[in-house]
Amino acid sequence: MNDSAKLNGHANLRIPDFSIVIPVYFNEGSLFATMDALNTQVLSRNDGLQGEVIFIDDGSKDQSLSELLAIKSNFPHLVRIIKLTRNFGQVSAVRAGFAHARGRCVIVISADGQDPPELMNNMLHSHFTEGNQIVICTREGREESVFRKLTSDIFYGLMRKLSFHSMPDGGFDYFLLGRWALDEMLSNDEANPFLQGQILWLGYDTKFIGYTRRERKIGQSRWTFGKKLTYLLDGILGYSYFPIRIVSFTGLLFALLGFFYAVVVLINWIVNGSLVQGWTPLMIVILVLGGLQLLTLGLIGEYLWRTLDQVKHRKPYVVDHIYD
């Protein structure tokens, strides 16, 4: 049965006012606590607003799915589970949640317990009362290790300098999108999306709410340095002309240096009747220019690979099963 047919089964139910999307990857130890916090601090506190919770199992190999099914048995009409065939990455999991959300707005929060669920009450008020299409919770502080703080500051600092000047200093992955903004996100079929960049690019009225990200109590992060680096490249190469521009300026600089060096050699030959001898100057020039050429080819290759990925129109995820 396809996804649309499965969704039609909800035609006789009231459309939720908001959908909470939670990507899950090796989070077996924190899922019950997350759902309990959502139920007591958000779902039961917003009279007149009906919500739904969508968990996306992104190919977890632990007992996350079993825990989710147990949670659903306790909240059969409130919880939905989207199981992907394998691990497609957090961004793809969030996009799967977007596609299956039925609410008038959608809130994305992690399953690790580091983001305070009670902020959703302020987010919902900002959207339904103040009319903001986008509400972003920004990390003004982090109860994390020095290394994680440093890498995060470097990551989002580069994004702020090179691609998105409106990127909050601490970045974000806890946010609300109104239905207009969500539909725009769904219509974007970018192959290697930088999710935060897409949200900022939309340009809708946005409210920022600051908070301190809590220390992780259960489990460990699967957001490795390699994944961060790949995501950083997606954000820079997909939304900034800086890499190509810096290569162009570097090429121009070395061309000018080569021209002036040729003039110096010519003057030396005219005045002294001798040319510069030896392998050292030649090898320096060859190695420097060769390295720059390889660097430039690598950069072009990154752009070409992303272009190839885009024209394939490959699905960002594959749904294995939907537990409605």
Which sequence ranges carry the predicted segments?
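Structured catalytic core of nucleotide-sugar glycosyltransferases
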Residues: 2-144
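Hydrophobic helical membrane-anchoring modules
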Residues: 2-17, 157, 194-324
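Acceptor/aglycone-binding surface of glycosyltransferases and processive sugar-polymer synthases
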Residues: 84-86, 90-100, 105-108, 114-198, ...
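Conserved amphipathic alpha-helical interaction elements at protein-protein interfaces in regulatory
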Residues: 40, 44, 70, 74, ...
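Residues in soluble alpha-helical coiled-coils and helical-bundle/repeat scaffolds
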Residues: 26-29, 114, 186, 190, ...
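Short conserved micro-motifs on helix faces and helix-strand junctions that flank
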Residues: 23, 84-86, 109, 175, ...
